[in-house]
């Protein structure tokens, strides 16, 4: 292919990347950035001809080849075929794409990927990007290093994550001491964090992605821009608060995109996001307030097994076009950067720096127009006669909102028992949600330690408890019937809400069954792998309450009908177990329903 035959080179490069992805994944367990994510990030960073781009955690070269393809298309669109101008511009971009990767084999693969994409492989180098700059490859030091005119204008990267595993954390003191984030931070009374510079305050370990974030922002030239994949928990977990504050005080956060949970499947289920950040120019003052682009990706073109998901036509047949929304997000970001008006939607919108919630929360979900509309609907009750808005934790003086203990029952769990008469049934969150008890686990209490027996007592529920799923798919509500309370242990993955007043209980059942309540719970979910809720989120959740229960009589009646239906279904399930067909066949009724 000719050097400027973009389609041919793109096809060869894509084929090679797919081949190496499959083979490396099998051999080394490497995690690769979804090509759709690469393309979106490159579009949103929008490199110009002559700008230097870098991936400091380069892997097999996905971002480098993506940058090169994007720049080559720009050259072709802005020059005539076979012209000296085109040749000159193609030569410029060939020398403008850089990569640093610690694994020697991956550097070789990245070079091959660049050759298959149409050259530009000279910038692919081996090194540890967390080392001091003077230890980098001389090629990088001369052509793409901090503090020089040749410093990178753009960094696009997906750094290694620790996943909070000790063996994946950075513990090298010689590295940690050179990073702000390698030191402890202290918070003053005003909530401002200060990072120590003392050697006595060097952390024992730090997550590599945190160090990469700092290194990337230090590396790019003033006025440069960064696109970096990070764990989703970075956006709102309190443990990352000091890093978010530092980021927002020293740089401009242009945008945040949360990625679909299947983005890196089947390699890993870690939930991820992308930060788009600009480094102020020298003497540039960061505005006190500005708009931040936010998006929540809902479609990624594949399922949890990595199988492609295509758009279907009107007849239900595949169009061959991947079903994803990353191009839509990139289009909206382009309009945002160009100052063009863009209609806010449920999943793509803007928010202001000053409007950010406590703890420098930058998770788009917390600012979703749809979810916040539900919050505003609840707050409106403060303006209605005979109504007020309060928190669920303040509804009753002796209200209890809690979850059971985390425990390990593997040594006392019995799989597929033939006799369950001396065993204790245990319900997972999904099992508790079932109207009939299909998914019962069985526990042998005679094998339990004294500590496990204490935990078993704590996992019992009381009749009338309202339970909310708090992990994975959060916000689903169920009710503790008499049978459940008398006979079952229930997973700690359900938050328990216990109230004494019957009207209040029915009212809460109806409230938690509503879309409004679900939206409020989704506003508070958090997590890097699975989404979670804590009892405190339920305690602090807003709810409208009337001065007199007669004002909510219809809602209370609806809640009571739900409770009555749950009890009736529970009794019917017990009856059919005891007197159904299994009884006629003289088979043990409980075990016939087991799906361990």
Language-model segment annotations:
Residues 30-157, 162-166, 173, 230-233, ...:
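Conserved S-adenosyl-L-methionine
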Residues 333-413, 547-596:
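Non-catalytic DNA-recognition/assembly elements of restriction-modification systems
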Residues 393-414, 430-463:
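Sequence-specific dsDNA recognition surfaces
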Residues 1-21:
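Long recognition/docking surfaces used for binding and targeting
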Residues 265-380, 386:
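Flexible, glycine-/basic-rich loop-and-beta segments that form/coincide
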Residues 192-263, 268-270, 274-277:
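Conserved Class I SAM-dependent methyltransferase catalytic core
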Residues 275, 487-495, 526-553:
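A short glycine-rich beta-alpha junction/loop motif
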Residues 457-459, 466-513:
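A short beta-sheet element
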């Amino acid at each position: 292919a000719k050097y400027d035959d973009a389609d041919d080179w793109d096809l060869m490069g894509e084929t090679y990347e797919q081949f190496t992805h499959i083979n490396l994944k099998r051999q080394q367990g490497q995690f690769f950035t979804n090509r759709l994510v690469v393309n979106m990030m490159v579009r949103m960073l929008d490199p110009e001809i002559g700008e230097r781009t870098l991936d400091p955690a380069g892997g097999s070269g996905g971002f480098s080849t993506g940058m090169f393809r994007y720049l080559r298309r720009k050259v072709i669109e802005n020059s005539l075929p076979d012209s000296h101008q085109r040749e000159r511009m193609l030569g410029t971009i060939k020398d403008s794409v850089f990569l640093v990767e610690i694994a020697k084999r991956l550097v070789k693969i990245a070079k091959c990927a660049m050759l298959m994409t149409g050259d530009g492989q000279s910038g692919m180098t081996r090194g540890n990007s967390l080392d001091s700059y003077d230890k980098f490859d001389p090629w990088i030091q001369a052509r793409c290093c901090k503090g020089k005119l040749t410093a990178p204008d753009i960094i696009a990267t997906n750094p290694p994550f620790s996943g909070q595993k000790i063996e994946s954390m950075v513990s090298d003191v010689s590295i940690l001491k050179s990073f702000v984030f390698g030191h402890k931070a202290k918070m003053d009374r005003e909530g401002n964090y200060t990072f120590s510079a003392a050697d006595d305050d060097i952390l024992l370990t730090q997550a590599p992605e945190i160090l990469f974030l700092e290194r990337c922002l230090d590396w790019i030239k003033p006025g440069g821009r960064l696109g970096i994949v990070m764990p989703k928990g970075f956006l709102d977990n309190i443990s990352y608060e000091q890093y978010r504050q530092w980021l927002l005080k020293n740089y401009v956060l242009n945008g945040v995109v949360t990625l679909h949970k299947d983005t890196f499947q089947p390699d890993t289920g870690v939930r991820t996001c992308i930060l788009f950040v600009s480094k102020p120019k020298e003497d540039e003052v960061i505005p006190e307030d500005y708009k931040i682009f936010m998006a929540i990706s809902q479609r990624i073109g594949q399922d949890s097994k990595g199988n492609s998901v295509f758009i279907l036509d009107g007849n239900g047949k595949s169009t061959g076009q991947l079903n994803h929304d990353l191009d839509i997000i990139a289009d909206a970001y382009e309009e945002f950067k160009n100052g063009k008006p863009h209609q806010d939607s449920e999943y793509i919108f803007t928010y202001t720096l000053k409007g950010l919630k406590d703890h420098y929360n930058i998770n788009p979900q917390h600012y979703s127009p749809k979810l916040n509309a539900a919050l505003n609907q609840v707050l409106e009750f403060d303006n209605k006669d005979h109504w007020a808005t309060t928190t669920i934790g303040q509804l009753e003086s002796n209200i209890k909102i809690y979850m059971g203990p985390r425990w390990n029952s593997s040594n006392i769990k019995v799989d597929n028992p033939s006799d369950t008469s001396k065993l204790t049934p245990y319900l997972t969150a999904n099992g508790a949600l079932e109207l009939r008890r299909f998914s019962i686990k069985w526990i042998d209490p005679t094998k339990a330690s004294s500590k496990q027996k204490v935990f078993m007592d704590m996992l019992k529920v009381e009749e009338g408890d309202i339970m909310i799923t708090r992990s994975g798919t959060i916000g689903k509500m169920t009710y503790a019937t008499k049978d459940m309370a008398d006979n079952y242990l229930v997973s700690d993955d359900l938050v328990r809400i216990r109230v004494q007043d019957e009207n209040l209980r029915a009212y809460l059942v109806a409230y938690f069954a509503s879309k409004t309540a679900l939206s409020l719970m989704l506003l508070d979910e958090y997590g890097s792998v699975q989404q979670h809720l804590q009892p405190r989120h339920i305690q602090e959740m807003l709810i409208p309450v009337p001065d007199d229960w007669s004002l909510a009589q219809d809602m209370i009646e609806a809640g009571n009908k739900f409770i009555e239906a749950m009890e009736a279904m529970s009794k019917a399930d017990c009856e059919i177990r005891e007197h159904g067909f299994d009884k006629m066949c003289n088979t043990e009724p409980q075990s016939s329903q087991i799906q361990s």
